[in-house]
Amino acid sequence: MISLQEAAAIVDASLRHAREQGLAPMTVAVLDARGCTVCLKVEDGSSLLRPEIASGKAWSALGMGFGTRNLAFRAASLPSFFGALAALADGRVLPVPGGVLIRSRHGQIR
């Protein structure tokens, strides 16, 4: 499992990178392998739904076992499958880039 300290370091590094790139205000969420939120930070100016979006991207990557950039590509070519998947997951699947799996050096999801 990922620790709070590790999750916070990932969130902080992600936000730092976003600032260096001049991106709009960000929200970053890190979930553990169970899908529970370990750390979530919302930058000033980030819009109302951003926490749900960030968590949805992370949850989708966990649920499918690969990042959401790949998920978005697959959703474009299999819309009926992803419509059914969204229904099965109570609308929580978010097939858009941004969700990344965090793995141990042995390949286990953290």
Segments and roles (model prediction):
Residues M1-R110:
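Flexible, solvent-exposed loop/hinge segments and secondary-structure transition points
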